[in-house]
Amino acid sequence: MKAAVAIGGTNALIAVRSRSETPPGGTDDRSNLPDRQFAWNDYIPKNNIGLAKGPSHRLLLHLKYRREGVPNRTDRETVEDALRTLERGFEWSNEGLLFTIGYSPAYFDRFDTDLPPDTGLRDPSEVIDQVDIERSGNVVVETDDAHMHLTSDNPLVLLEAEAALFGDVSEINGEPVTADFSEIFKKVDRRTGFTGAPLPHESWKEDVPGDNPVTEEAPVLFGFKSLFTDSQPSEDHVAITSSDHPFCGGTTEHVSILRDDGVRKWYSEHCTEERIDRMFSPSHNSDETGQHGRKLGRQSGTSEQSMVDIAEETVKNAREHGVVGHAQKLARARNPLPPLLRRDFPSTDNGHPHTQFISLQRTIDDFIDVRKMMSFVDPENERPAASEVPIENHGIQGFFKVIRRGNYLIPPRHLRAFPSPNP
């Protein structure tokens, strides 16, 4: 079923339809839906520590507007009708369909007016300039106009939704398709992925040539649980909440591809304790974390120290141990609250292991601040590279490469169809 989502298209849809349960239907009354497009957490189950459990199957669509200049009223109405078709067809839930559509700086450059300065959107090139250290190589800036993130526990839903958006089916879940994107948007990229064990193991086995280092119990490709109550904020925390802001109820979204070709080296060159040092911190050990981090419980620190306290020892650990932890570095930006709401997921698109990284934050500056903490042992140093440890001891940085970056504004639901910069 995961493979069908990765392949996409009519044949995959037909194959999945015969093996899938009928999903719950949606609503034609938009007042029954949250105005925040990214309000997912109240509509999906919680895991054993009370965090929202992300749906198993993911689909990302990168879209380019087919016309020059500012979108016209007819196209705006068509986009809204197409999105409402999805809402009529599927319940707003993990068993139905959850989705967002966001718009890039390149899209807003079509207009003569600017976004309000406190909206928080920035060009992805500015992110690359500030956080991607030289060894990351050349990172591609996304130049699409719009980005959609669709998710469901039912792979049939994703395939039917995509088919409806591009005019390949006449109805979804018994609802007629009254409008589509086919004359509005060009699909410039399509990315897929999955969450939750055993999908990382199974997907690697199916898609990636060679030995499979990922265990069946691993929640992600690098093996360790990474979402805790001290690393995931609420949706409120990342939302634009000022009632006089034109995009109140919106948020900013960062989207990047991390090529995880170092995963095999991660497992082959480091034992479990060494991987724990690099994923969490030198203060952690396997007795407390377990093989996949699940023994840590609600928070990512140890029984003796919070992760915020451990984070204060980052420079000291680099000097004394020659190694620092990924979570340890990031926690320096999480005091008092974590600024990034992560919705990333593993992927094996095109036979390569990836992380499709997605975060929501109040402003892109928040993402930059967090990513600097990940990039440098001592980001406040005038010469931060002088304090670095070898890349293979620098959290997980030596095991992936950033390929592409994009930033988007996710407007509230009532402004989601081709918003103007200052509606």
What annotation goes with each model-predicted range?
Residues 1-2:
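Terminal low-complexity, intrinsically disordered regions
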Residues 5-423:
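Long, histidine/aromatic-enriched segments associated with O2/redox biology
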